Amino acid sequence: VALAVGVGVGWHQWQQQPTFTSSHLTPRGQARTITLPDGTALSLDADTQAQVTLYRDRREVRITQGQILFAVAPDSARPFHVLVGPARVTVGGTRFSVRYRATGMEAGSAKVAVQEGHVRVAGAQGTAAADAAPAALVAGQALSVSPAGVLGPVSAVAPGSIALWRKGLIRFENTPLADAWWNWSATGRPAW
């Protein structure tokens, strides 16, 4: 019995050891795309910070600032999780964007938008809404998550309008000027 318990504990410890880790930072005015060992592509917008950890049984990206467009390689044995402020996004293989600002007008909130496939969004552990039911999003849908982890309503979004920054574009609609200016300044481009 002791041997079986020891093997079980050892197996669990082995599963929890990362097989790959990396940290990424893109300064204002720059963007870049990285490809992970599993084939997943991460397109990081300007002023973005993220940590990547791949395990034997799961894949995780923690965004501490900024915006990333994910093109996740399918792997049913290793789900892909994005941990971002008040939210946790879980996918199998899809294309979606996650935005999080630690400071500024939208401080502490997250926005998830799906270009292809589907994702599940839930409040992060430790938030007031961690036990609430997750939301399932499909292509052409988006939602925001409050700093307390409360999921906002699902809204329609044109898949082609997701991650416009990759095309050198930025779009504002019904956005207060202060919010627009703060978001524009992160691009590092002159406003004239």
Model-derived regions: residue spans:
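Amphipathic, non-transmembrane alpha-helical segments in extracytoplasmic/periplasmic proteins
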Residues: 39, 171-192
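Single-pass transmembrane signal-anchor helices and their membrane-water interface zones
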Residues: 1-19
